[in-house]
Amino acid sequence: MEFIDLKAQYRALQGEIDANIQRILAGAHFIGGEEVAEFEEKLAAYVGRKHCVSCGNGTDALQLVYMAYGIGAGDAVFCPDMTFIASVEPACMLGAAPVFCDIELDTYNLDPVSLEAHIQSVLAEGTLRPRAVVAVDFLGNPAKYDEIGAICKKYGLLLIEDAAQGTGASYKGKKCGS
């Protein structure tokens, strides 16, 4: 059973899609180029930011963030237990340990109460350094950034928004991914 008729959506836009694909293939600028620059400009404007740096996929984007902040071996990265593997795979590739926290059943997003309990548990155990929290805008539902942000501030943790599923959604008037 098809949930969404992708073929009908393609047929409705087929001329425009095919023409743009042919134009891009003919230009042979697959990495960088004017299409990427245009995309980054438009996405930055859409989410209300000056800049946007696009990546090949969300996994690469998260890995760049982890690397930029020096997250690696011995570090704990807290994330919801209901997410796509890409939310934590890059942290694991760099040697960090994911700590899975419960979700709220009404939003499927990171439960701030569970997050704080897991942070306290990791601190009490003493084998990992709490470093970051990955909040996922699961199925387009923004996480509770005010509460999660306050917890991150309290413990000195980096808050990373995994907005791969949240493009177009807003939290308190701010676009996800901004």
Feature-to-residue mapping (PLM):
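Hydrophobic "anchor" residues on beta-strands that sit immediately upstream
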Residues: 1, 75-76, 157-158
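N-terminal "arm"/small-domain region of PLP-dependent enzymes with the aminotransferase-like
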Residues: 1-29, 34
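Active-site phosphate-binding strand-loop segment of PLP-dependent enzymes
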Residues: 106-178
